[in-house]
Amino acid sequence: MSNESNDLEKNISHLDPTGVDNAYIPPEQPETKHSRFNIDRGTLRNHFIAAVGEFCGTFMFLWCAYVICNVANHDVALTTEPEGSHPGQLIMIALGFGFSVMFSIWCFWWGFEPSRFSLFVFGQSHLTSQMCSDVVSSDHCWDGCWWCR
């Protein structure tokens, strides 16, 4: 009988005199929507930087493509207005969009690589060294490149 009473005492030892279970700790309730999703200043700052980068890249792509389309549509060689699009215009517009994407990707991948760009933003690197590091960087080369031999 004493063995059973010891087990009973162990089972109710975590109860306070009112019978409330002190071992149960309720989970923290989120106070705001931001704490529920674990969004702090650093996370918001990173999302803002990513959004600005996406905006700049998209704007550069669309602006370059817009300029190419205007140049193609105002060709002085076409003296009369054709009823449809001229094949030369279509090829120029297609190549313009392709080169616009290529230029935007090249600018934002190599020029704004996070390690180099953060050094520039925080004043540890100058603009000229930022540009030179793009040229000299081995990231641009491949194994068969004559420069890297």
UniProtKB/Swiss-Prot annotation:
The chain crosses the membrane at residues 48-68, 90-110. Gene3D superfamilies: Glycerol uptake facilitator protein. Keywords: Cell membrane, Endoplasmic reticulum, Membrane, Repeat, Transmembrane, Transmembrane helix, Transport. It comes from the Eukaryota. Induction: During exponential phase in rich medium and repressed in minimum medium, hyper-osmolar medium or in sporulating conditions. It is a multi-pass membrane protein. Residues 69-89 are extracellular. Residues 1-35 are annotated as: Disordered. It is found in: Endoplasmic reticulum membrane; Cell membrane. GO terms for cellular component: endoplasmic reticulum membrane; plasma membrane. Residues 1-47, 111-149 are cytoplasmic. InterPro entries: Aquaporin-like. Aquaporins contain two tandem repeats each containing three membrane-spanning domains and a pore-forming loop with the signature motif Asn-Pro-Ala (NPA). Water channel required to facilitate the transport of water across membranes. Involved in freeze tolerance, osmotolerance and cell flocculation in liquid cultures. Is non-functional in most laboratory strains. Belongs to the MIP/aquaporin (TC 1.A.8) family. This is Aquaporin-like protein 2. The gene is AQY2-2.
